[in-house]
């Protein structure tokens, strides 16, 4: 498993924090967005959308969204639950995440 990151970008930072909080040992590859490394032919093979974060697997599969990566890691490494323990907690956390992403992050992008 490899995590394609960019230290200065906000979306991969969220995944990087998630990985650290769960104490997951994963190979991290920094992608230099300022110099256009995400547009290179090599990176386009990994993610044709040319974005980070990316979590890639030995079989060639990839996850390319913070939500997808977090969901996968939460299911794969449940010992440190970050997305809630009970159904109520999971629902409240999902609701808060949606609110942050839609009302907070989307507003900042405008």
Model-inferred region functions:
Residues 1-110:
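GST-like domain detector, emphasizing the conserved glutathione-binding G-site
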């Amino acid at each position: 498993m490899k995590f394609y990151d960019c230290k200065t970008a906000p979306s991969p930072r969220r995944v990087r924090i998630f990985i650290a909080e769960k104490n997951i040992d994963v190979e991290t590859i920094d992608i230099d967005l300022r110099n256009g490394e995400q547009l290179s032919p090599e990176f386009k093979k990994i993610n044709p959308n040319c974005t980070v974060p990316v979590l890639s697997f030995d079989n060639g599969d990839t996850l390319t969204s913070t939500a997808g990566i977090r969901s996968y890691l939460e299911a794969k490494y449940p010992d440190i639950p970050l997305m809630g323990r009970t159904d109520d907690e999971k629902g409240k956390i999902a609701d808060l995440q949606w609110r942050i992403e839609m009302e907070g992050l989307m507003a900042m992008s405008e």
